[in-house]
Amino acid sequence: MAASRIASANALGPNRVSFARIKEPLEVPNLLALQTESFDWLLGNERWRARVEAARKAGRKDIPEQSGLEEIFEEISPIEDFSGTMSLSFRDHRFEPPKYSEEECKDKDMTYSAPMFVTAEFINNDTGEIKSQTVFMGDFPLMTAKGTFIINGTERVVVSQLVRSPGVYFDSQMDKSSDKELYGCKIIPSRGAWLEFEIDKRDFVGVRIDRKRKQAVTILLKALGWTTDQILERFGEYESIRATLEKDPTAGTDDALLDIYRKLRPGEPPTKEAAQALLENLYFNPKRYDLAKVGRYKINKKLGLEIDITQGTLTEEDIVATVDYLVRLHAGEKELVRPHGTFPIEVDDIDHFGNRRLRTVGELIQNQVRLGLARMERVVRERMTTQDVEAITPQTLINIRPVVASIREFFGTSQLSQFMDQTNPLAGLTHKRRLSALGPGGLSRERAGFEVRDVHPSHYGRMCPIETPEGPNIGLIGSLAAYARVNSFGFIETPYRKVVDGRITDEVVYLTADEEDRYVIAQANTPVNPDGTFAESQVLARRKGGEFESVAAEEVHYMDISPRQMVSVATAMIPFLEHDDANRALMGSNMQRQAVPLLRAEAPLVGTGMEYRAATDAGDVILAEKSGVVEDVTADYITVLADDGTRKTYRVHKFRRTNQGTCFNQRPIVEEGQRVEEGQVLADGPSTEAGEMALGKNLLVAYMSWEGHNYEDAIVLSQRLVEEDILSSIHIEEHEVDARETKLGPEEITREIPNVSEEVLADLDERGIIRIGAEVVDGDILVGKVTPKGETELTPEERLLRAIFGEKAREVRDTSLKVPHGESGKVIGVRVFSREEGDELPPGVNELVRVYVAQKRKITDGDKLAGRHGNKGVIAKILPKEDMPFLEDGTPVDIVLNPLGVPGRMNIGQIMEMHLGWLAKHGWKVEGDDAEWKRRLRDIGAHEAPPNSKVATPVFDGAREDEISGLLSCVLPDQDGDILVNKFGKAKLYDGRTGEPFKEPVAVGYAYFLKLHHLVDDKIHARSTGPYSMITQQPLGGKAQFGGQRFGEMEVWALEAYGAAYALQELLTIKSDDINGRVKVYEAIVKGENIPEPGIPESFKVLIKEMQSLCLNVEVLSRDGMSIEMRDSEEDVFRAAEELGIDLGRREPSSVEEV
């Protein structure tokens, strides 16, 4: 076989026959860099320093000089007291090694963090005395190598936030009355007061200071020290400024300052000094106002200024230049000429990615630490004034509680710190690459309009246009494109190949969205000659605003780096994406993240070449850190002897529970004595095979209807998949119980449980905890626990007997941990923590027991399956394999799909995948080169493949239609020499029940199917009696509360329409909230009597009480006009309940744990 190209450019990945034609000059960058690099910058660790050094050598200009923590400590230093006699400053933060490992933290519910120390210097300016001390600043949560944080034992991810960049923005809107375009402008800082300018329909230029009332802009200019003559000299040619000056009542600077003060602080006596200080504090005080470097950069760029990038406050020049730009825009000018260049005058598009930036993890945590330090600063100031100057040391001034609290608050409660989605490795990877416009300082779901959510041309290569949730968050949450990176200002850049004089070079340049607008960019699949020139004189290229047209080859400045540049990782794993409708591709991207890891992972026959990188970067496989030889392999450990003589032992995790209850299990794939290279996969994780992402299974699929059982997206499945555990998965649930200190004494974990038979306790050990390996079903005891009961008042006789015969055994009740409803499985692990053993437990807890129960779930009807093209469905019927339609050689198909699901949904990719899957399974060989497609395949080395080959068809650069239809006639025969599928990809199928052939040939092939996390076992639910709501006494709702089924308004209408009066009455009373009726009916059923008349529903009594609380006199009258008394309890109910052994005095359980 000709050496087929390897799709995964990484030589360590498995071989795939690739249909790609385009050579990519750049590898996909590390997919977790968005998280890890940002956090490295925050800490300023060695990795970050090395990266900065490398960038400096490469000549990059936008590199940050300081780490995130250095920036804040420098910002806050020095903290001076009110008189300026003492100051406290901070420098040189450092971290000690973490106290506990990641594993210990997960195990013991702790936070994975390292102690942070800072050198604090206290200076007494009067005496010149300096006291220096290293101060502990609290434990700082650390990021794991996988880009996650471990907070209180659970893995969390901090999502990057998309926000509007600080800077100056010009906008325009049409005035309805005068049909004039009205221009406005906002200067938005990173923190501080906004400054807004606007021109109204009478050409009056107004300014709003800090969102207050509008004033003439000339008042602000005069307050800054300008005279009327200076204003006229600079802006005299513009009608708008002259009109504004006429309406301006103020005379000079003092007058203008007082006028501003009156508008901002109405009711306070205006003085010149107060007004000056107010304006100073709003815009010119670095403590109160900060544009941040990015804001300064944007203002300089927009207004053509050359102010130093470290200037964080506004300057007079900024305000003048902004007014200048605004009046020029209003006057209809198109260009602004400055000494160092010409700048366009135009309004801004706020949805453009040049105006939206990312706040990554580092910056989000930095802002939180800044908040904590600002709170600490107040404490330090107060302590400086109250403590004795001689006795002051940095340690006595500093209170670290606000800093620690604000960091903890961020990780625990912020909208952007999220419980990690760990269903499978792709879900975790995508979660870490997520971009959210929600969160503090961002948008809110309700306010976000259509424009913000829509795809924008500037998203190209930066944010995926496909992957976003369905529902209320659509367009507000996105995913970073595969090649994108974030620069030091927080803008997303995407790489392009430089084109010089019509020749493509291998130089790669990263461009931000606003730089890209200036260039003409060709697409990645433009035909190219071997010498790097364009094959055609006219090239299809993009210009500003996403418009594309045919341009001369010499006009092109850059070229896309790869066809998959515009999509995210999950979307790049959909083969034949180019043949799918975008709505279905969106569902396909999202559903890959919901695939549960199966018992045996199987990589797709038809992939895209992205599988290897996605799996290795997600961090759930084990990679060799150095090249060497494998010395020792067991299920739990792999030891590698590196070439430099060092040994490294890798821990292999077995059957762990993920956040979503799926199974995290790693398996070694290397053998003793095997040579391994650096970066090679040593052990597979969940949903990976040989280091490739393997989320589902390759199944033999037929597109045909089957007795209507696959109507409306339902799926018919073969029993083989159940018997052979092909779609079985393991799910692990964690059950926890703690023994607390109560007012009546401590709770106890024990085997001695009152009123429980010995066989129920058979699987418990002597401590009362279930043994590992026990099979349990719902209701079984996992951990025996008793709680002291309140002593009742004793009668004198009892007291006498107690005094004679000594203390009776104290009363306890059974509060054991039982398996919840509908759950079962095998106990695979038990963890016991106790205060006596020295474990750290929450206050009031003496002992904590965790039990892990695993269950193997076979595929069953009601489970949800999906392909990668948004083709999802629910299993309606599982047929015995002998009844499934079968091929001519007797092979029954695995899955029967409805062909009507394809044309309307326009996801034809699934059909292409199915045909190519058949080809990959059986192999092919192309003879001759008498056709264009044959020559193309020969050029890329894909003209032959043995049976069971894996193929790669990259996004937008994959196998073409003519190649697939051509290859279907070149497929290799099977062992019997038969070719079962004709050149159209269709096979003759026979009905498994009768053996008769179906009338028409049917499309048959191999497709990749995922089992989604929506499993019927988690959804099915039934209740006989259970908890009731406290007030209305109606059953609770939902499976989690063990609730009932709501019989709603529309269902009532249905019964009313049938006139089913008695059924309706029962539903409204005894089946719901007629308390007395419930008990009486139970009694009647037990005694075999007729069902008595229903009583009055409790919610009716609640309604009356509610009306009475509004001071309305409400009475209930009987038919004969007598007032009915609503008594709360009836004696015979209590009597009946007592006879039936129902304890009405006990508290009803209010949650499923207690049921």
UniProtKB/Swiss-Prot annotation:
Quote the PROSITE patterns the UniProt record gives.
Answer: RNA_POL_BETA
User: Has UniProt tagged this entry with the keyword Transcription?
Assistant: yes
Its Enzyme Commission number(s) read 2.7.7.6
Could you provide one GO biological process annotation from this protein's UniProt record?
A: DNA-templated transcription
Q: Which InterPro entries match?
A: DNA-dir_RNA_pol_bsu_ext_1_sf, DNA-dir_RNA_pol_bsu_external_1, DNA-dir_RNA_pol_su2, DNA-dir_RNAP_su2_dom, DNA-dir_RNAP_su2_hyb_sf, RNA_pol_bsu_bac, RNA_pol_bsu_CS, RNA_pol_bsu_protrusion
The annotated subunit structure for this chain is: The RNAP catalytic core consists of 2 alpha, 1 beta, 1 beta' and 1 omega subunit. When a sigma factor is associated with the core the holoenzyme is formed, which can initiate transcription.
By sequence similarity, the record places it as follows: Belongs to the RNA polymerase beta chain family.
Describe the task this protein carries out. Answer: DNA-dependent RNA polymerase catalyzes the transcription of DNA into RNA using the four ribonucleoside triphosphates as substrates.
Protein name listed in UniProt: DNA-directed RNA polymerase subunit beta
Q: What species is given as this protein's source?
A: Thermobifida fusca (strain YX)
* Gene from which the chain derives: rpoB
